[in-house]
């Protein structure tokens, strides 16, 4: 999947990410991935749910991947950070 169909969720308001996802689907993307780490995970889940329930009701969750990434802190210690990838897709009938 091309990297331009990936939305990296950070600290901005949820509606910014919702708009990005809706725009990608409206431009013809068949699948959009929402990625987040740490505290932004709940914002990524909110983004996927708002897209599905309020804007594009034909969009489905294809799959969800969760993982843990090991990062180095400012002090040099290793810390574990959770991450999530939510794969949204539109059924064929809606895009053809």
Curated annotation (Swiss-Prot):
Belongs to the histone-like Alba family. Coiled coil: none annotated. It comes from the Archaea. This is DNA/RNA-binding protein Alba. One of its GO terms (biological process) is chromosome condensation. InterPro entries: Alba-like_dom_sf (IPR036882), DNA/RNA-bd_Alba (IPR013795), DNA/RNA-bd_Alba-like (IPR002775). It is found in: Cytoplasm; Chromosome. Keywords: Chromosome, Cytoplasm, DNA condensation, DNA-binding. GO terms for cellular component: chromosome; cytoplasm. The keyword Nucleotidyltransferase does not apply. GO terms for molecular function: double-stranded DNA binding; RNA binding. Binds double-stranded DNA tightly but without sequence specificity. Involved in DNA compaction.
């Amino acid at each position: 999947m091309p990297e331009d169909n990936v939305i990296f969720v950070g600290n901005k308001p949820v509606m910014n990410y919702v708009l990005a996802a809706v725009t990608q689907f409206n431009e013809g993307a068949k699948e959009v991935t929402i990625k987040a780490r740490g505290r932004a995970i709940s914002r990524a889940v909110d983004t996927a749910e708002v897209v599905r329930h309020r804007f594009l009701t034909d969009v489905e969750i294809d799959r969800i991947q969760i993982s843990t990434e090991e990062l180095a802190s400012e002090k040099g210690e290793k810390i574990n950070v959770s991450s999530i990838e939510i794969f949204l897709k539109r059924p064929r009938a809606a895009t053809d």
